[in-house]
From Swiss-Prot:
<dbReference type="GO" id="GO:0006508">
    <property type="term" value="P:proteolysis"/>
</dbReference>
<feature type="region of interest" description="Disordered">
    <location>
        <begin position="235"/>
        <end position="274"/>
    </location>
</feature>
<feature type="region of interest" description="Disordered">
    <location>
        <begin position="489"/>
        <end position="588"/>
    </location>
</feature>
<feature type="active site" description="Charge relay system">
    <location>
        <position position="116"/>
    </location>
</feature>
<dbReference type="Pfam" id="PF00716">
    <property type="entry name" value="Peptidase_S21"/>
</dbReference>
<keyword id="KW-0378">Hydrolase</keyword>
<dbReference type="InterPro" id="IPR001847">
    <property type="entry name" value="Peptidase_S21"/>
</dbReference>
<feature type="compositionally biased region" description="Polar residues">
    <location>
        <begin position="568"/>
        <end position="579"/>
    </location>
</feature>
<protein>
    <recommendedName>
        <fullName>Capsid scaffolding protein</fullName>
        <ecNumber>3.4.21.97</ecNumber>
    </recommendedName>
</protein>
<feature type="site" description="Cleavage; by assemblin; Maturation site">
    <location>
        <begin position="568"/>
        <end position="569"/>
    </location>
</feature>
<keyword id="KW-0597">Phosphoprotein</keyword>
<dbReference type="GO" id="GO:0030430">
    <property type="term" value="C:host cell cytoplasm"/>
</dbReference>
<keyword id="KW-1188">Viral release from host cell</keyword>
<keyword id="KW-0720">Serine protease</keyword>
<keyword id="KW-1035">Host cytoplasm</keyword>
<comment type="similarity">
    <text>Belongs to the herpesviridae capsid scaffolding protein family.</text>
</comment>
<dbReference type="GO" id="GO:0019076">
    <property type="term" value="P:viral release from host cell"/>
</dbReference>
Length: 605
């Protein structure tokens, strides 16, 4: 009784266009040609296991694309095992194309998708010692992954359907394969079933799971073999074991527990990370008090934020036209204003004698429009032209917006040293305070710290206590005059110079040397220190009613500027010798009294 095979398996076992890396896998074309056609069928095994034959190879054929193999699977036990595997294997049941269901074929494509030819090693001679010859081809195995590229196996119950998947196979060879299959069907009897070594088959399946890049290599083999997509091959699909039902794809209900509830992107990020946040593996619980302590410590350790310096508005450009076209200045004289306009600030400004009334003060509305593009510069030497503009608040950036500017912190504030007696130990409760001793080094340190503190206080007093005296970067250029009624035709004046950086605050004696206002007029608030450029000879020949009686006033710009440089680079000792204003003297005297009391309390009674 002849039993037809249940499943056919065909494929290339060697491709010359994809040579293997190992030299022992190369097949000599002359040797292959001498061994064909086969004199008898070759065994078909699983994973090269000798005790696991499942069918026979009825032909090997040399084509232009490579060596082609055709075999049939006839083992009943193995076919029954394939049916059982199919019902429990998700990969075997997956299909990319709508093809008829074939449990055995689909299970074979998922488990054993490659062919492997076992041939004689090239270094071993075929001739034996007794004069016999060894068979060059030993057997063909169906396996998880072959070592030669392009050895993809195609399974099917119809031999013609299997052969049409190989587009590189010549039609003449395909016809010869069908003839040989029919001849083998007639000559073969009832196949003998051998018990399958299930333990070895499971071990080989486990080993196949650790093959590196197995799916990618199978896709490469399919491309080399030039097999179209309409087949049961699983190498074209990446494994996808997680295919939940539609009911499971709906989002879970939102949690109402405030301890585990996440909102917004936090919940989405936890889901995208594999639910680690929900599982609680990457999270730790910290008490609220501990968390607040850590947060406060982190904030305390941050460096202090640097307060930006006030933005100094650029000086308005100097215009010679305002001086050249100005009429003679005197009581009631007006000024010719350039084209344009500006708005004055509330409170008005000092404009000199207006309308013959000495000491007149012009009060302006907050929105009074004046034909000037910018507020006029303050010409202090010419009281009949313009007066000092209102103080300008510190600006940040380019927007006219006043902000609060905190005073710099006292970084060098003196700290008290721990009180220790001469033996180095502390005072216990009840001990007399007269036992307190302090060495000379400690006293020197306290004196140095107090000197630095006095210097810092003096600088702060000069910077913030006398803001109206000194250089003002927001105002216009300043001029000096020797007469009470302003500029004379034979006098010379100096074009103001722009200073890239504001000079240090002036000393108190410079502020005290400011010129008094002309008689009969109200003196405006000083905004800058005048620099005289008129020589003494010219001043003596002046026709002004008031003479300069202050011999200590600097007469040259270089002398005044040198004084500024000295002030900028003065040390603490030099500053202590300079005269100060009465307000600075009072502060210094108060600090000296505090220092004396501090020393008296620390000294030995």
């Amino acid at each position: 009784m002849v039993q037809a095979p249940s499943v056919y398996v065909c494929g290339f076992v060697e491709r010359p266009d994809a040579p293997p890396k190992d030299a022992c896998l190369h097949l000599d074309p002359l040797t292959v040609k001498s061994q064909l056609p086969l004199k008898k069928p070759l065994p078909l095994t699983v994973e090269h296991l000798p005790d696991a034959p499942v069918g026979s190879v009825f032909g090997l054929y040399q084509s232009r694309a490579g060596l082609f193999s055709a075999a049939s699977i006839t083992s009943g036990d193995f076919l029954s095992l394939l049916d059982s595997i199919y019902h429990d294997c998700d990969i075997a049941q997956s299909q990319r194309l709508p093809l008829p269901r074939e449990p055995k074929v689909e299970a074979l494509h998922a488990w054993l998708p490659s062919l492997s030819l076992a041939s004689l090693h090239p270094d071993i001679p075929q001739t034996t010692a007794d004069g016999g010859k060894l068979s060059f081809f030993d057997h063909v195995s169906i396996c998880a992954l072959g070592r030669r590229r392009g050895t993809t196996a195609v399974y099917g119950t119809d031999l013609a359907w299997v052969l049409k998947h190989f587009s590189d196979l010549e039609p003449s060879i395909a016809a010869q394969i069908e003839n040989d299959a029919n001849a083998a069907k007639r000559e073969s009897g009832c196949p003998e079933d051998h018990p399958l070594p299930l333990t070895k088959l499971i071990a080989k399946a486990i080993d196949a799971g650790f093959l590196r890049n197995r799916v990618e290599t199978l896709r490469q083999d399919r491309g080399v073999a030039n097999i179209p997509a309409e087949s049961y091959l699983k190498a074209s699909d990446a494994p996808d074991l997680q295919k939940p039902d539609k009911a499971l794809q709906s989002p879970p209900p939102a949690s109402t527990d405030p301890a585990t509830m996440l909102s917004g992107n936090a919940g989405e990020g936890a889901t995208a990370c594999g639910g680690s946040a929900a599982a609680g593996q990457d999270l730790i619980s910290v008490p609220r008090n501990t968390f607040m302590t850590l947060l406060q410590t982190n904030l305390d350790n941050k460096p202090p934020r640097q307060t930006p310096l006030p933005y100094a508005a650029p000086l308005p450009p100097f215009s010679h036209q305002a001086i050249a076209t100005a009429p003679s200045y005197g009581p009631g004289a007006g000024a010719v204003a350039p084209a344009g306009g500006y708005f004055t600030s509330p409170g008005g400004y000092y404009a000199g004698p207006a309308g013959g009334d000495p000491g007149a003060f012009l009060a302006m509305d907050a929105h009074t429009y004046h034909p000037h593009p910018h507020p006029p510069p303050a010409y202090f030497g010419l009281p009949g032209l313009f007066g000092p503009p209102p103080p300008v608040p510190p600006y940040y950036g380019s927007h006219l917006r006043a902000d609060y500017v905190p005073a710099p912190s006292r970084s060098n504030k003196r700290k008290r040293d721990p009180e220790e007696d001469e033996e180095g130990g502390g005072l216990f409760p009840g001990e007399d305070a007269t036992l307190y001793r302090k060495d000379i080094a400690g006293l020197s340190k306290s004196v140095n710290e107090l000197q630095h503190t006095l210097q810092a206080l003096r600088r702060e007093t000069l910077s913030y206590g006398h803001t109206g005296v000194g250089y003002c970067p927001q105002q216009g250029p300043c001029y000096t005059h020797s007469g009470p009624y302003g500029f004379q035709p034979h006098q010379s004046y100096e074009v103001p110079r722009y200073v890239p950086h504001p000079p240090p605050p002036p000393t108190s004696h410079q502020a005290a040397q400011a010129q008094p206002p002309p008689p009969g007029t109200q003196a405006p608030e000083a905004h800058c220190v005048a620099e005289s450029t008129i020589p003494e000879a010219g001043a003596a020949g002046n026709s002004g009613p008031r003479e300069d009686t202050n011999p200590q006033q600097p007469t040259t710009e270089g002398h005044h500027r040198g004084k500024k440089l000295v002030q900028a680079s003065a040390s603490g000792v030099a500053q202590s010798k300079e005269p100060t204003t009465p307000k600075a003297k009072s502060v210094s005297a108060h600090l000296k009294s505090i220092f004396c009391e501090e020393l008296l309390n620390k000294r030995v009674a």
